[in-house]
């Protein structure tokens, strides 16, 4: 994860693992339970349990919609890189370009290319989801998941034998508690965001898949398997990225998309011809991981309309709604495709950042009696242009002063969609669901559904404490950290 590149080493891993056990497992068991008990997707499922919580189901549909508004774009970029390395293997293209940074910059600034690859990735998702869970998603995963593990192992072994790789392992697993003591909330919100995103929690996916879970299946066993396997894959991915960066870049890396599309391409370029093969395997496994996640999110949105139609006695219309949902999301992907991943219009991109487009640059300073030290103030002219005051400007009573809020809210469209979904809706949804199970529906609902399969429910006290206290309180801290970090 790029997140662990920022909040480093075991401080991040430790918090992630604790959250996965105390929050992730409990939330997943809860979502599986709700899905299987009702046999419905989020909106219909929450409505069946209690009409008062129907809105929580709608929130669980909006969340994956927002995630896909940037995830589809990243998936398209991964496809482009995987195919680029494939053509390089056969000598059809020189993918290891001389100036990788320039290529990455020109690619993300090329709106046409970004839109094209996003559209192709979306089309693949729509085709699989339109085929249904059994015929589409399950068949893909039966082939894709084993292939993912095989490619992971191949690249891990190759990277492990490179000189300098040990530095990457020390970086990942070496003990460092400084971030925990200096900035615990940032580590917490970063690890929580990664956990929710990686486990697809708080966005209806596990409720939807739970609705397909057979009664004979053990809910707890399935939840444990998902949490363990997902965490294992995440650690294995880190065992590729960080050792590779230390072996070939001396530990210097980017973060966010730059780590995946810039630092790793530089790594493969330094491998020579073998880098084409390793690059193809690496981006192929990222592609498999990406499309398996994006399909599950598109399924949440599609199944919402399918369930609605079935309840009204109409034909399910799965194919129609999968394609319709994909087309609508494609429109909302356009800002992510066209803002140059944060370059904005000032940097030559087609569209500006959210602060520009949504008019969030300026806010009145409010009722102040003097200038605050270290704060820049602006006045608005008759022409609508904001002018920054000089450092020695005198305060004028009754004058309206403005603050440039873009200095704090300066993320790109990817960050904006991510903040709304991963930053707010996911932890909020998990917090409310856990509270409802712990205090309203009670742990008995979960126990009864889990034991309906003939498997004894284990850890009743543990799960009850998680639902009543640990998850709601923990997610409240995460929400606070997410919002305060994004808005400055």
Predicted region positions:
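C-terminal membrane-solvent junction of multi-pass transporters and transport-like membrane proteins
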Residues: 301-302, 309, 313-326, 413-475
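Flexible loop linkers connecting adjacent transmembrane helices
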Residues: 8-9, 29-56, 82-100, 135, ...
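Loop-to-transmembrane helix boundary motifs in multi-pass membrane proteins
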Residues: 115-116, 229-235, 279, 288-291, ...
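Extracellular/periplasmic helix-exit of transmembrane alpha-helices
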Residues: 31, 158-172, 233-261, 328-373, ...
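Short, small-residue-biased leader/transition segments that mark boundaries at the very start
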Residues: 2-7
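Hydrophobic alpha-helical segments and their helix-loop junctions in multi-pass secondary transporters
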Residues: 71-94, 149-175, 246-247, 336-340, ...
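Membrane-interface loop-to-helix entry segments
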Residues: 74-85, 117-158
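Membrane-embedded translocation segments of transport machinery
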Residues: 138, 142-295, 306-324
């Amino acid at each position: 994860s790029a997140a662990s590149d920022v909040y480093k080493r075991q401080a991040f891993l430790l918090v992630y693992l604790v959250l996965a056990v105390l929050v992730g497992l409990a939330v997943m068991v809860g979502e599986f339970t709700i899905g299987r008990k009702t046999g419905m997707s989020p909106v219909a499922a929450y409505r069946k349990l209690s009409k008062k919580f129907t809105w929580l189901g709608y929130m669980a549909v909006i969340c994956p919609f927002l995630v896909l508004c940037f995830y589809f774009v990243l998936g398209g970029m991964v496809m482009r890189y995987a195919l680029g390395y494939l053509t390089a293997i056969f000598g059809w293209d020189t993918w290891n370009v001389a100036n990788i940074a320039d290529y990455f910059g020109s690619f993300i600034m090329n709106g046409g290319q970004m839109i094209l690859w996003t559209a192709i990735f979306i089309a693949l998702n729509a085709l699989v989801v339109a085929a249904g869970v059994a015929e589409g998603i399950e068949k893909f995963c039966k082939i894709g998941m084993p292939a993912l593990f095989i490619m992971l192992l191949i690249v891990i072994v190759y990277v492990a034998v490179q000189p300098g790789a040990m530095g990457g392992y020390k970086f990942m697993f070496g003990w460092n508690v400084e971030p925990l003591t200096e900035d615990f909330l940032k580590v917490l919100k970063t690890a929580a965001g990664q956990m929710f995103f990686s486990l697809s929690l708080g966005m209806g996916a596990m409720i939807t898949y739970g609705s397909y879970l057979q009664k004979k299946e053990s809910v707890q066993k399935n939840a444990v398997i998902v949490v363990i396997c997902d965490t294992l894959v995440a650690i294995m991915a880190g065992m590729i990225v960080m050792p590779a960066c230390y072996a070939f870049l001396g530990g210097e890396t980017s973060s966010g998309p730059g780590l995946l599309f810039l630092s790793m391409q530089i790594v493969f370029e330094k491998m020579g011809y073998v880098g084409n093969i390793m690059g193809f395997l690496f981006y192929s496994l990222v592609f498999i991981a990406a499309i398996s996640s994006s399909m599950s999110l598109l399924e949440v949105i599609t199944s919402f309309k399918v369930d609605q139609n079935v309840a009204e006695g109409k034909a399910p219309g799965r194919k129609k709604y999968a394609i319709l949902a994909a087309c609508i999301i494609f429109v909302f992907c356009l800002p992510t495709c066209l803002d140059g991943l944060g370059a904005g219009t000032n940097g030559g991109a087609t569209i500006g950042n959210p602060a520009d487009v949504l008019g969030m640059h300026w806010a009145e300073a409010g009722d102040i009696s003097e200038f605050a030290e270290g704060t820049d103030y602006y006045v608005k002219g008759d022409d609508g242009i904001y002018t920054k005051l000089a450092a020695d400007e005198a305060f004028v009573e009754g004058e309206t002063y403005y603050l440039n809020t873009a200095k704090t809210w300066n993320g790109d469209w990817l960050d904006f969609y991510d903040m709304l979904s991963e930053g707010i809706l996911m932890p909020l949804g998990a917090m409310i669901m856990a509270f409802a199970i712990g205090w309203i529906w009670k742990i008995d609902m979960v126990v009864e559904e889990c034991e309906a399969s003939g498997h004894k429910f284990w850890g009743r006290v543990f799960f009850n404490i998680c639902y009543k206290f640990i998850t709601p309180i923990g997610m409240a801290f995460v929400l606070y950290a997410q919002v305060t970090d994004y808005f400055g």
